[in-house]
Amino acid sequence: MTMKISKTHFLAFLLGISILITSCSDSLSDTTDGRLRHWISTLSSDEFQGRAPGTEGGKLTKNFISKTFKDLDLEPVKGSYFLEVPTSEITLKDSSYLTLSFRGDDRKMIAGKDAVFWTKQAREYRKIRDSEVVFVGYGIVAPEYNWNDYEGIDVRGKTVVILVNDPGFATGKLRLFNGKSMTYYGRWTYKFEEAARQGAAAAIVIHEEESAGYPWSVVENSWQGPQLDLQRDDLGNDRVILEGWIRDSTLNDVLNFTGFNYDALKEIALEKTFSAFSLRGLTLNSEIHNKVRYLQSHNIAAFKKGNS
């Protein structure tokens, strides 16, 4: 997560600068290629330590970009190149755990190997006890596609388990969502948001490499360690308590004890008559221990005055 945020800022800087130079004077335009190569080489070097906000590398990055703006005779916004962005950093402690239980048989998820989990709620301690696990298919409510995986079920306080992507990808049918092209309904961000709107206590997306578009290692590396987010007035209480991913192979192993079959669940989720249902006897227990830190990050912005 940290790297995702810093890469976004890094790429936005390069894109903005390249557009700006192209539209400015001939002297700048003539050196666009060389300058971009220099900036990319510099910012991607080990000296900048990953460029993460709230770190020494982040500070070096901000100073480098602001100096570059100044060297290009760009104007600061309201007297400063730095625009304040109140940020929270939540780090999951090792004492946290996630357990799936079936009729007294507990399976503790090994962080990184079996599953990853976190909370967007900026609190030092959260817990979930004996939360009923519900399979909600793709976890989508899309009136324009006449699709509602949550219709007829109350998941308040429960744990929803969700397939990644959307039904169009699984079937390849162009008239079903957008075929193989993922819609926003297929993204994990939407699935967590919808689960929160439905009042779920926890939401876990099932990772399949083909459907997700990336291997498990991406999930493992992105969601462990400090997680950055915007500071929120409600401390993130509008989110579910626990968000996470589980490997498809891990879930399949768990389901083998319950009498359910993972491949069968995927097929059922594509039926027009699909209704979400409880995975009877399967419950989730979790304790989340966080280190919460608040910091002042920055966006860096500048402009060049036009001639008219």
Model-identified regions with their sequence ranges:
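Bacterial N-terminal signal peptides that target proteins for export
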Residues: 2-11
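Bacterial N-terminal signal peptides
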Residues: 12-22
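N-terminal hydrophobic or amphipathic helices/low-complexity stretches enriched
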Residues: 24-76, 87, 97, 216, ...
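Structural recognition of the beta-strand scaffold that forms the well-ordered cores
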Residues: 41-44, 133-136, 159-163, 202-206, ...
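Acidic/His- and Gly-rich active-site-bordering loop/insert found
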Residues: 43, 69, 103, 247, ...
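Noncatalytic luminal/extracellular "stalk/propeptide" segments of secretory-pathway proteins
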Residues: 49-174, 278, 287, 297-299
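Long, well-ordered, tryptophan-enriched scaffold segments
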Residues: 197-214, 223, 228-299
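A conserved hydrophobic secondary-structure block that centers on an alpha-helix together
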Residues: 138-217
